């Protein structure tokens, strides 16, 4: 950090450009921190300062492209959103929408089990078609972890772009849940009446998602709807890993 502090802006830009011409990230430092309310440790992967600069550059390019395509009720690691907004949405669904049943989902070991190939395809699917950039992201995902070797899956917590990548992975799940009811649009919808009819007389599941990182809730009006969502999620979430 002290070395970078002595660099001029031009020197930093030239260095980062030189790194990107044939990018090879340095090994990530493994740090274990305590999990709140648990005896277990949370593994973090801390990149070197120059790799953090590269990740910040990538974040500033990707975030404006991805943000409009993320679901409106995903609140974790996003600009101008917080846990307070997620809580407000939950309160609104309970008090105004009468959604009293909750499917509470926390994906165990999510960050450590992200499928690299699927993630890169999802980035492509969001309209990011710069193969050179995708290649650099692939190299970041494969950064060696000191004392552990090269990972075959997962995105290390501690990286600057890891939160954005996690939202990209879970964006498909957000929209799948939402399309079951909240954003469902029947093909022949000609009026609001038809839209309401289609909701009532189909096998759609009545539920609304509220997600913060890998922890999300689906609010439902009945126990039966919550049970249907729960069983469907067990099946649909497997390809995410």
Question: What do these predicted regions represent?
Answer:
Residues 1, 60-73:
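Charged boundary/loop elements
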Residues 1-20:
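Surface-exposed loop/turn segments and immediately adjacent short secondary-structure elements
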Residues 18, 24, 28, 41, ...:
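Acidic, glycine-rich two-metal-ion catalytic cores of nucleic acid-processing enzymes
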Residues 19-27, 31-32, 69-73, 78-81, ...:
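Conserved polymerase palm-domain catalytic core
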Residues 54-62, 165-169:
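Active/ligand-binding-proximal structured segments within catalytic/core domains
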Residues 231-240:
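Residue-level detector of conserved catalytic or cofactor/ligand-binding positions
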